[in-house]
């Protein structure tokens, strides 16, 4: 369910008296804004396929990304089609097993294609990097449309390659897109796919985004028995999925919407503390 941020009138008046906090400046580039293209996802079957097919698509995207970076240029619309088929390494742990004879060639190719840092991050993501099906994202945007949202500042704090951006409805295309992605390889692909978006490649806990700014914070947040080190929230001892809710509520403006996919760990856990925290700050 969407969560609407609410505040007392005195707090709103105080905000209006303060100077507006600006977002970090966009990265400087010689590429003209008119030459930039945001990819549009039109295939609901994106990400569907067997393990070997996903591997081949991933490798094609990685090799193209490295080529683009060597040539210091942005992807063309045709090249964005190739990049869009990157689905990460969730469910592909066999590609990292040097003792798996059925994947011996794939292991060699993968190991040779990635830097040590990229390889380590990819291997660590095999249990966590699962992408959101288009049908789910479309349903979330339908709900957002029914709430009356048409355009504004949208933040996706765990954006992956940017499927939430790629499925943005036509009616919301005038929105300003902001993404955060902790994985370098995935974030770099997202930057090539959504060239007009402002995407930061770092953990959500390290982002310097203004409070009370975004109209919508949307996405599929990470989950697990992991605590994020963020001094602003450490006292609450939030697990990672709950932390994303807490920080998102501070980033969204009063009257804005937080709309997340999360595990049952947020709404069904025995302790009510996280639910109390959310209820005190939103409706």
Summary of predicted features, one role per range:
Residues 2-20:
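Repeat-associated, polar segments at repeat-unit boundaries in modular proteins
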Residues 32-193:
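Class I S-adenosyl-L-methionine
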Residues 176, 197-198, 283:
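Conserved beta-strand segments of alpha/beta enzyme cores
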Residues 180-184, 238-283:
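Conserved Class I SAM-dependent methyltransferase catalytic core
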Residues 196-204:
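Conserved SAM-binding strand-loop segment of SAM-dependent methyltransferases
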Residues 208-218:
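A short acidic, Gly/Pro-enriched loop at the edge of an enzyme's catalytic core
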Residues 218-225:
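A short SAM/SAH-binding and catalytic strip from SAM-dependent methyltransferases
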Residues 231-236:
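Short glycine-enriched, charge-decorated loop/helix-capping segments at active-site entrances
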């Amino acid at each position: 369910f969407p969560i609407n941020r609410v505040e007392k009138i005195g707090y709103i008046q105080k905000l209006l008296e303060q100077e507006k906090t600006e977002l970090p400046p966009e990265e400087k580039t010689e590429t003209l804004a008119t030459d930039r293209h945001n990819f549009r996802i039109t295939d609901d079957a994106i990400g569907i396929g067997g393990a070997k097919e996903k591997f081949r698509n991933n490798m094609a995207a990685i090799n193209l990304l490295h080529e683009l970076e060597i040539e210091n240029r942005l992807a063309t619309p045709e090249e964005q089609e190739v990049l869009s088929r990157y689905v990460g390494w969730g469910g592909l742990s066999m590609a990292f097993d040097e003792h798996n004879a059925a994947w011996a060639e794939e292991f060699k190719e993968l190991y040779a294609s990635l830097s040590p840092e990229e390889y380590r991050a990819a291997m660590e993501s095999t249990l966590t990097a699962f992408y959101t099906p288009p049908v789910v994202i479309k349903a979330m945007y339908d709900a957002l449309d029914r709430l009356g949202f048409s355009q504004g500042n949208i933040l996706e704090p765990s954006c992956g390659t940017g499927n939430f951006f790629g499925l943005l409805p036509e009616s919301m295309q005038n929105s300003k897109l902001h993404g955060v992605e902790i994985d370098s390889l995935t974030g770099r692909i997202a930057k090539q796919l959504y060239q007009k978006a402002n995407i930061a490649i770092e953990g959500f806990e390290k982002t310097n985004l203004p409070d009370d700014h975004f109209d919508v914070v949307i996405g599929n947040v990470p989950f697990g028995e992991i605590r994020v080190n963020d001094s602003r929230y450490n006292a609450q001892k939030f697990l990672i999925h709950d932390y994303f809710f807490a920080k998102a509520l501070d980033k969204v403006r009063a009257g804005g919407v937080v709309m997340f996919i999360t595990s049952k760990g947020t709404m069904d856990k025995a302790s009510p503390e996280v639910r109390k925290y959310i209820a005190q700050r939103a409706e």
